[in-house]
Amino acid sequence: MSKDEEAAPQSEEQVLLRVEALREAARIITGDRDVQYGGPEDNLTRIAKIWSVLFEREITAEEVAMAMVGVKLARFVSKSGFQSDTWIDIAGYAGCGYEVGKLATGE
């Protein structure tokens, strides 16, 4: 199998499922969540400040997003079967972590 064949999606259905998951994550992280909790930078920074006190070291907003992905991964261990909401949450935290990391580094 060539490199191109390995990288190519198996079917249109698979591509659509991937896009569906990412669109749902995007809908959640760009929807009314900002109104409820503030934008990702504000919300994750607020959590980081609390965790910094608890863990007695500086925690960044990006580290909070990474830790939340870890929390979601731990949920997979505790339950069996397909967990669509957990996959969506992981994608959402990845998007937020990307945003705050990029803003923090100026890249």
Q: What is the meaning of each model-derived region?
A:
Residues 2-107:
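Intrinsically disordered, low-complexity regulatory regions
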